[in-house]
């Protein structure tokens, strides 16, 4: 019996200004779905896996084909419903309604665990959508680069006087998310040693210039790091190995990095983390044949790695969980103080979230990099005083290789997102851009996620696990007229640990799009300010007042 999730075909998004669907509002999700499976974008495109363990774009290849066929014929008053990667219905709505509504991986809380999900997955009844895999707005490793860069820069401010020159970062994982780390470190002025067990992933990052060098030798990696830091150079190296082996070995040797973190796919103990002593081939085979054995061995190995991270933390080295739930896995394995070191959001990112600042992104449906160059220039023009953002855009232009359709990530917040969206739409309307632009974001944003071990860890009022907020975010984006809206469970940290929502909106140059863009790109980040104001953060309360938000139970207006 053939595997419905495996196909050797190569998928690439159409380019140019010729429509394959009835309008740009259906052409946009069509192209972005296909872009998610571009071999230059996805981790394992032949298996529909985009990133993050088993984060898929569609449930099966038949479902992919059905989604594509449906989008090509969808009318401007119809909405396609996608249930865990399967196109289950088309319904009459109206022209300002989303063209696609997506729900991925959602389970009733009592059953929201990997065992139950994997059982459903095996039967073909579910699909893990991660965050931007199943919501069709993954743009390659760039999608996390700026967030990682902002994190490292803030760590430098807090611990090293704002200067990471001559410093180095130890981390693990070079997958779809972790692959951003070495480049982000270098852009922040630091060196990076990234441990990766799968050499094909390291090679992918070398090819796309996200990492500078590769080695199989720990001694060589350390020698390179030592030489670079002494010379004040910012460079990165991938070490082929197992983080659960390398991290403790560095502790044993007394090696002291300047910052320690990890972005292995520890959120998925079957598909995301290589057990100690295993080969990658053995691991892949046993994922199918004996997943329970894999999970047990992986969890035990995670405990070993987290203990090493605790050893670094106890030695006074800034150490953070980068949102893969590895501390939780170690805690469940009996490591009682696994949460002694913080997650990256409460440590470095939350003040940005309080102002609705997060991973705003856009992609050029034309496929022409010049369209991104023009939008970069427009961002600088509209935000002339944000020198930090200008610096980011300059570095991104120089260092970031596009994967699939040209795209840009740019952290901006409430008050700026809608201005950029309207400006991009005007550029489409007057012909400055060769085709429409889509604007989206990661589900990791200020108002769109409940994740007590990551984005909502250690909330001021203790509301870490309250997931009303992402549900309200999805509902409001739907009511506001986003082109497609998604509601997922388990992204980033795994089953049972998160709920989150996404939106994408198309700038097709029309006046109708102006109205939708103004609503969506104001309301979406405003929910983040609202959520943090409700939790009692002064920055959010002040920003809500400044932006004129009407929050009756919070501001009394």
UniProtKB/Swiss-Prot annotation:
One of its GO terms (molecular function) is urocanate hydratase activity. GO terms for cellular component: cytoplasm. Binds 1 NAD(+) per subunit. NAD(+) binds at residues 52-53, 130, 176-178, 196, 201, 242-243, 263-267, 273-274, 322, 492. Keywords: Cytoplasm, Histidine metabolism, Lyase, NAD. Its cofactor is NAD(+). The active site is at residue 410. Residues 1-20 are annotated as: Disordered. It is found in: Cytoplasm. Its EC number is 4.2.1.49. It catalyses: 4-imidazolone-5-propanoate = trans-urocanate + H2O. One of its GO terms (biological process) is L-histidine catabolic process to glutamate and formamide. Its main location: cytoplasm. It is an enzyme of class 4 (lyase). Pathway: Amino-acid degradation; L-histidine degradation into L-glutamate; N-formimidoyl-L-glutamate from L-histidine: step 2/3. Pfam families: Urocanase, Urocanase_C, Urocanase_N. The keyword Lyase applies. It comes from the Bacteria. Catalyzes the conversion of urocanate to 4-imidazolone-5-propionate. Belongs to the urocanase family. This is Urocanate hydratase. It comes from Brucella melitensis biotype 1 (strain ATCC 23456 / CCUG 17765 / NCTC 10094 / 16M).
């Amino acid at each position: 019996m053939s595997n419905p999730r495996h196909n050797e075909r190569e998928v690439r998004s159409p380019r140019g200004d010729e429509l394959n669907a009835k309008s740009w509002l259906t052409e946009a999700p069509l192209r972005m779905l296909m872009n998610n499976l571009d071999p230059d974008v996805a981790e394992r495109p032949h298996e529909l896996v985009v990133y993050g363990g088993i984060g898929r774009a569609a449930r099966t290849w038949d479902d992919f084909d059905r989604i594509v066929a449906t989008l090509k014929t969808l009318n401007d008053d119809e909405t396609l419903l996608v249930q865990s990667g399967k196109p289950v219905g088309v319904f009459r709505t109206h022209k300002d309604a989303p063209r696609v509504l997506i729900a991925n991986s959602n389970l009733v809380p009592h059953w929201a665990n990997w065992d139950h999900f994997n059982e459903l997955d095996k039967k073909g009844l579910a699909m893990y959508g991660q965050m931007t895999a199943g919501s069709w707005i993954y743009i390659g490793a760039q999608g996390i680069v700026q967030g990682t860069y902002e994190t490292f820069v803030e760590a430098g401010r807090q611990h090293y006087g704002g200067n990471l020159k001559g410093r180095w970062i130890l981390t693990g994982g070079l997958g779809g998310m972790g692959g951003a780390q070495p480049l982000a470190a270098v852009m922040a002025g630091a060196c990076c040693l990234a441990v990766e067990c799968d050499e094909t992933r390291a090679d992918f990052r070398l090819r796309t210039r996200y990492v500078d060098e590769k080695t199989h030798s720990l001694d060589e990696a350390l020698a390179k790091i030592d030489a670079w830091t002494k010379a004040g150079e910012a460079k990165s190296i991938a070490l082929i190995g197992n983080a659960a082996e390398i991290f403790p070995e560095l502790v044993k040797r007394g090696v002291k990095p300047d910052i320690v973190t990890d972005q292995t796919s520890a959120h998925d103990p079957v598909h995301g983390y290589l057990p100690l002593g295993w080969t990658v081939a053995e691991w892949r085979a046993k994922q199918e044949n004996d997943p329970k054995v894999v999970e047990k061995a992986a969890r035990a190995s995670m405990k070993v790695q987290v203990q090493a991270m605790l050893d670094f933390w106890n030695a006074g080295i800034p150490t953070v969980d980068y949102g893969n739930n590895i501390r939780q896995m170690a805690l469940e394995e009996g490591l009682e103080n696994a949460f002694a070191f913080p997650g990256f959001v409460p440590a470095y990112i939350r003040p940005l979230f309080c102002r609705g600042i997060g991973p705003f992104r856009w992609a050029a449906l034309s496929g022409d990099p010049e369209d991104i160059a023009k939008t970069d220039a427009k961002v600088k023009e509209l935000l002339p005083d944000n020198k930090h953002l200008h610096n980011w855009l300059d570095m991104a232009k120089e260092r970031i290789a596009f994967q699939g359709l040209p795209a840009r990530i740019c952290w901006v917040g409430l008050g700026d997102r809608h201005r950029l969206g309207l400006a991009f739409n005007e550029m489409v309307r007057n012909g400055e851009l060769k085709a429409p632009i889509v604007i989206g974001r990661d589900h990791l944003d200020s108002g769109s996620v409940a994740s007590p071990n990551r984005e909502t860890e250690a909330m001021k009022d203790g509301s870490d696990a309250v997931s009303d907020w992402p549900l309200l975010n999805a509902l409001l984006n739907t009511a506001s007229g986003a082109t497609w809206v998604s509601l997922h469970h388990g992204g980033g940290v795994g089953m049972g640990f998160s709920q989150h929502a996404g939106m994408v909106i198309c700038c097709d140059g029309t006046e109708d799009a102006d109205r939708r863009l103004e609503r969506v790109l104001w309301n979406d980040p405003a929910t983040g300010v609202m959520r943090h104001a409700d939790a009692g953060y002064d920055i959010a309360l002040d920003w809500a007042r400044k932006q004129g938000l009407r929050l009756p139970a919070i501001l009394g207006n």
